[in-house]
Amino acid sequence: MSFHAIVIGTGVDALVAAHLLARRGKQVLLVEERSPAIRDFGWVPSQIVAELGLALEVEAPDPWAVALLPDGAKLELWRDIGRSSQSIRHYSERDAQKWPGFCRRMAALARLFEQLYLEAPTDPLNLRFALGVRGLGREGMVDLMRLLPMPVTELLDDWFECDALKGALAAMGILNIQQGPRSGGTAFRFLHHHVGSPEGVFRPPRTELSTRLRQLARLGLYFKAAETKKILTKAGRARGVLLGDGEEIEAPIVVSGADPRRTLLELADPGWLDPELARAVGNIRARGVAARLLFEGPANGNLVFAPSLDYLERAYDEIKYGRVSREPYLEAHSSPRGLEVHFQYVPQGAKEDFGDLAATARRLLPGLENAKLVSILGPADLERDEGWPQGQPYHAELALDQALWMRPLPELSQYKTPIEGLWLCGPAMHPGGGVAGAAGYNCSQAILKEKI
């Protein structure tokens, strides 16, 4: 059987790209070595859901965060802005009054990025981008220009005084990156994780989009559970894949959901790349910084242990020296499997007994004292089980120099590689992790414009 395209699948973006190409009448083979178990994290744009022809359930937890404090107190943040203000008022009357204005201004900035995230990355001098910024008005333009490079600590200190509120919000600026809240660019990452969420909600949803797409039969789409050993090339052009069992399958288009380093330096022949580009690909930063713990037991809501900005900065200090944080940032979410706990920071190759992580989680999160631990996955385990390079779920760190029109490199930002017919669609591509399926959507649209 002949195929128009082969998609190398390692996650939601590869699934979205494969389904959308098949929906446009292409014969597509999706080669997937593993079926990741972790739920998809991030905004799923309604445009993608509509084009896939899905009815997708998106969780809407309320409160969306319960910020825990060391003394046992808690700050509940609700989807209703007024109700959150009432909660904040117990800690600061001033912050309660400022909360609605903060939510309004962050939502205005996030809406600009919603437009940018569903298309190939735009050059900052592009007229449409400039008009979008102009549409923010003077106040919004100042907010955007100040926010992009600044540490999230400065953004939040400008608005609030309550440590618990600032810590819970700042956590989205350091999620899955080896930086602390005082690092430059963390305010941009805070905003990135707000894109697509309702005004006043600063946690992206979780969905079962990948699971639904694996279950969805589509004319022209074929699945094969196999390891991709090589991307075959001839005269500088992709011509198919070599599987782990030695089978060769040909197609004029190969779309890789694997990270750029693995795709271009291991699966494909790097000899087809300019040496400077090959060096730059090898230097893309993709460091995992977290472990995932799963506990059995009853649901405990959406818990955050990030009691202050200073606490988060101290947690980050440990990983700089290759150590697991003894006082970590924790984020816990109920799921059909139990309570999933994000434990940050855990460096790649950490030597500590992972049993200590469970003890720390039990100490800091209520209700886990007698809960059975099901599993602990460190960065190396997440690379093996989920296909995340070095345990980095975004395949390339979402730092400001690896974002937007520079994601993951300016030379690769349009999803096309220098090897003719080879495309990149994984979360290392614009807009990055935290927007489920958008990179796969954008890549598929770029391929279809080539009229394959």
Feature locations, PLM:
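Mid-domain catalytic core of redox enzymes
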Residues: 199-206, 227-337
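Active-site/ligand-binding neighborhood in enzyme catalytic cores
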Residues: 107-220, 225-226, 388-397, 401-402
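A conserved FAD-binding loop/helix module that cradles the flavin
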Residues: 427-448
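N-terminal glycine-rich phosphate/pyrophosphate-binding loop and immediately adjacent elements
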Residues: 2-118
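A glycine-rich dinucleotide-binding beta-alpha-beta segment and adjacent secondary-structure elements
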Residues: 162, 166-179, 327-329, 366-430
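Hydrophobic residues within alpha-helices
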Residues: 17, 209-212, 443
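C-terminal segments that line or cap access tunnels to active or ligand-binding sites in enzymes
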Residues: 298-386
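Hydrophobic, well-ordered secondary-structure elements that form the walls
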Residues: 255, 295, 341, 360-361, ...
